[in-house]
From Swiss-Prot:
Highest taxon listed in the record's lineage: Bacteria
Family, as annotated: Belongs to the UPF0194 family.
Coiled-coil residue windows: 108-209
Presence of the UniProt keyword Lipid metabolism in the record: no
Cellular localization per UniProt: Periplasm
Keywords: Coiled coil, Periplasm, Signal
Position of the signal peptide: 1-16
GO cellular component terms given for this protein: periplasmic space
Protein name as catalogued: UPF0194 membrane protein YbhG
Organism taxonomic ancestry: Bacteria, Pseudomonadati, Pseudomonadota, Gammaproteobacteria, Enterobacterales
């Protein structure tokens, strides 16, 4: 009987040891796994035309899924098409002027300028000789001082005409001045810039989706006259999907960039999403009121941004998420 009692006692001791060991192992596993609480953070963007005008058409409505590169809406293109035509004409004029400056003067123009110099030289010689004769007559008191002054004036005018013709011939032979060529080139570049701006304005009168997403709001309707930058749509981006969470300083070493984690939602507690820490704030901040934690050991925390690598449409903006660290979550 005593032997049986001893055996039973030993069995109880062994069983208690097994239970205690199992509990210790379970607790150690729990202690090694950090748990944080955060919320889904999906970026939204306000889409607008970069230029103003009358809304011609809108191709999507609230709730529609959109794809990157999809045409979402258009303004009335006519004003921008007219501006583009004017800019092209301006480039043509400036290009022609610049080409003329580079080419210089034709042989025919140089010959005409040389002939003008000869004609001006002959006129000057005649005026100079006439003045000389009038000067002699004035000395002999044959003509008045007024007659002499008229002869001098005619001589001076002929001299000025000759100098102008000589300067023009010299310019024709040497070509256009570098300053004039540079000015013509600058005018051409300005016209080309205006053309590029006109092309861009016409392009921006069509609103293109920058990325995949879901249309949340449609702020205007066709016929609305918009100023540039006026919001037309608000879009929730499909990617990336992040979880915003906070970690205290004591556990900061476990939350390093690249660390993989599991993300649990109330809707699928047995099928976690997978995430990877992409950003850890370099500065501490006071615990936000929205943070849900079972035990905050400090008022200062560090913000985490966790990228959800297998996100789907079930994740919604602001949805609460449990972030589980541990060996099962894996590391980089």
């Amino acid at each position: 009987m005593m032997k049986k009692t001893v055996v039973i006692g030993l069995a109880v001791v062994v069983l208690a040891a097994v239970v205690a060991g199992g509990y210790w192992w379970y607790q150690s596993r729990q202690d090694n796994g950090l748990t944080l609480y955060g919320n889904v953070d999906i970026r939204t963007v306000n889409l607008s035309f970069r230029v103003g005008g009358r809304v011609e058409s809108l191709a999507v409505d609230e709730g529609d899924a959109i794809k990157a590169g999809q045409v979402l809406g258009e303004l009335d293109h006519k004003p921008y098409e007219i501006a583009l035509m004017q800019a092209k004409a301006g480039v043509s004029v400036a290009q022609a002027q610049y080409d003329l400056m580079l080419a210089g003067y034709r042989d025919e123009e140089i010959a005409q300028a040389a002939a003008a110099v000869k004609q001006a030289q002959a006129a000057y010689d005649y005026a100079q000789n006439f003045y000389n004769r009038q000067q002699g007559l004035w000395k002999s008191r044959t003509i008045s001082a007024n007659d002499l002054e008229n002869a001098r004036s005619s001589r001076d005018q002929a001299q000025a005409t000759l100098k102008s013709a000589q300067d023009k011939l010299r310019q024709y032979r040497s070509g256009n001045r570098e300053q004039d060529i540079a000015q013509a080139k600058a005018s051409l570049e300005q016209a080309q810039a205006q053309l590029a701006q006109a092309e861009l304005n016409l392009q921006d009168s069509t609103l293109i989706a920058p990325s995949d997403g879901t249309l949340l709001t449609r702020a205007v309707e066709p016929g609305t006259v918009l100023n540039e930058g006026g919001t037309v749509f608000t879009v929730s981006l499909t990617r990336p999907v992040w979880v915003r969470a906070y970690v205290d300083e004591r556990n900061l070493d476990q939350a390093q960039p690249g660390r993989k984690v599991l993300l649990y939602t109330d809707g699928r507690p047995d099928k976690p999403y997978h995430g990877q820490i992409g950003f850890v704030s370099p500065t501490a901040e006071f615990t936000p009121k929205t943070v849900e934690t079972p035990d905050l050991r400090t008022d200062l925390v560090y913000r985490l941004r966790i990228v959800v690598t297998d996100a789907d449409d079930a994740l919604r903006q602001g949805m609460p998420v449990t972030v589980q660290f541990g060996d099962e979550a894996g590391h980089e």
